[in-house]
Amino acid sequence: GVTDIPKTPDEFIDALKKIKDKTDAIPLYTNYAAGWTMGAWDAYIGNNATGDNTYFNQKFLHTKDPFKDYGDGTHPYAVYKILYDAVAGGLTEDDYSTTDWEGSKSMLNNGQIGCMVLGSWAYPQMEAAGENADDIGYMPFPISVNGEQYASAGADYSYGINVNASDDEKQAALIFVKWMTEKSGFSYNEDGLPVAKSSSDTKLDFSGVTFLEDEPAVEGEEDLLNALNADSELNVNNGGNDKIQAIIEHAANGDESFDDIMNEWNQKWTDAQESEGVEITE
């Protein structure tokens, strides 16, 4: 069986094969039909796949052929290839068009599904979907960069206090915000990282994993990613769910290789870079 958390794409695919061979569970459930669930794959191409918190908002914009194979199981190519290989290898549901997002929660809870690719926000929903919350865990994305694993950390919705409120209202609001962030335990209950700097309480077992927070775009390029996404129509990490669905379709039908898909994406990105006059730095 699977005794260790997989840390590389090869280890992850091997674990999926063991689930298929030794159980009746669906190894990896794609949630293709929901559409929006596909966006989770885009979220892992930055910090998780490169170990570089300047990659997604800065270097990615200037990289030549960012979807190329780096040959070491890292970068965007490695992220999307996991999905392609899992589908092509029969390690996902039999019919991707009939997946059911709401139903998948209880299926994971009761052991009918081995794993799904989702953000940590979904973890408590899976726990609440049945009687087997203790059987559910949340693992880092299975990519290692020079032997190290990385995960993205990001703030949730922020709190604001109305500048036009009365002094008493502002004081009451501040007390509420401090209670929410320091005393309520909501981040722990929602399986997130603690808000309070002094706290280390979390259900996530990410020991040995380095958390990174994306650096913003450099000055003058705040809108460049949006422009490249629009020009290329790839919409990376911006609702480009159809391109991820296409990976599943081609892998299932066997009518286009993964490298051909990535070559198409590289060409679209190159054309967009040329349209926007982007300097290619690597």
Question: What do these predicted regions represent?
Answer:
Residues 14-18, 60-96:
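Glycine-centered hinge/linker elements that transmit conformational signals in sensory
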Residues 1-5, 89-91:
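Aromatic-glycine-rich donor-binding/catalytic loop that engages nucleotide-sugar donors
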Residues 40-41, 48-51, 78-169:
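Extracytoplasmic/periplasmic substrate-binding proteins
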Residues 22-26, 58-69, 88-89, 155-160, ...:
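Flexible glycine/proline-enriched surface loops and loop-helix/loop-strand junctions
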Residues 119-132, 144-243, 276-282:
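C-terminal lobe and pocket-closing loops
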Residues 8-15, 37-41, 76-83, 104, ...:
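Stable alpha-helical elements in mature extracytoplasmic
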Residues 14-21, 102-116, 246-254:
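Short helices/loops that flank or line small-molecule/ion binding pockets
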Residues 13-65, 113:
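Extracytoplasmic/periplasmic solute-binding protein
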